[in-house]
Regions:
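Structural preference for beta-strand elements that scaffold enzyme active sites
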Residues: 15-17, 38, 162, 185, ...
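Short acidic loop-to-helix transition motifs that present clustered carboxylates
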Residues: 22-26, 191-196
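PLP-dependent enzyme catalytic core of the Aspartate aminotransferase-like
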Residues: 176-187, 193-231
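Single conserved hydrophobic/aromatic residue that forms the stacking wall/gate
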Residues: 1-10
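Conserved small-domain helix->loop->beta segment predominantly found in fold-type I
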Residues: 80, 100-167, 196
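Active-site C-terminal subdomain of aminotransferase-like
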Residues: 45-124
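Conserved PLP phosphate-binding loop immediately N-terminal to the Schiff-base lysine helix
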Residues: 14-46
């Protein structure tokens, strides 16, 4: 019988490395839930400094890694450190404090406040996400990539509050400009092999919209009205 990737890692004493930069702005991150040993995180995508980090499940893992710093060759994390700007590093703490304060909690350790805040943020954004997907999918001229059409067959319902869509017969730049003129900032989806395979170029491109902690139900309704005026 075939083995799942995680089972192969356990059998061969290998480690699983996951880049969680895409989900970290929306959900609390837990090693056990993800089945990972090392997590990669781009702090810039969280609104922080342009730094990235690798987070290890257990400090004993450092013993198996070669040193990057010839001066520090011990068993700890110091041997893996590379020089970074102190100014950039100084922005990490305030970023965490900001995320920990989103839910308004002021008591408990920063770790506890961060967990409480991210749990609340995840629940709130999930409600906004459900409305965004539900209302946008009711517009007959709108195609949500990976959600409607053949490519969505068998797709998971566990989604982030971010989607890419196209409006039939309307170039993506026109959609983008109409949204921007109405106070809605989105992004033109870049050309990638995956999007090309999904037929994005054939329909005139697509637009990506992502929700954040300061978005409201009114924002979702406003976006739907503007898109409906095009569709």
């Amino acid at each position: 019988a075939s083995l799942a990737p995680s089972e192969m890692c356990i059998r061969d004493s290998a480690w699983t490395l996951l880049d969680v930069s895409a989900i970290a702005p929306y959900r609390p991150i837990n090693f056990d839930d993800l089945g990972a040993d090392i997590l990669g995180l781009d702090l810039g995508l969280l609104g922080g400094p342009q730094l990235a980090a690798l987070v290890f499940r257990d400090t004993r893992m450092f013993r198996r890694l070669d040193a990057l710093d010839p001066v520090h060759t011990g068993k700890g994390a110091r041997k893996l450190e590379t020089p970074i700007s102190s100014g950039l590093a100084g922005g990490v703490g305030p970023l965490v404090d900001h995320l920990a304060a989103l839910a308004g909690g002021e008591s408990g350790s920063r770790r506890k406040r961060l967990r409480t805040s991210m749990d609340a943020l995840s629940a709130y954004l999930e409600e906004l996400r459900a409305d965004l997907y539900s209302f946008l999918s009711t517009l007959p001229a709108v195609h949500i990539l990976g959600v409607t059409g053949e490519a969505a067959a068998g797709a998971s319902d566990d989604r982030l509050p971010r989607l890419t869509f196209a409006v039939k017969g309307v170039p993506a730049e026109t959609v983008y400009k109409r949204l921007f003129d109405n106070g809605l900032v989105t992004t033109l989806a870049p050309q990638t092999p995956l999007l090309t395979e999904m037929g994005v170029e054939e329909i005139g491109g697509a637009v990506t919209v992502a929700l954040g902690p300061f978005n409201t139900y009114h924002d979702v309704e406003h976006l739907i009205r503007v898109v409906a005026s095009l569709a």
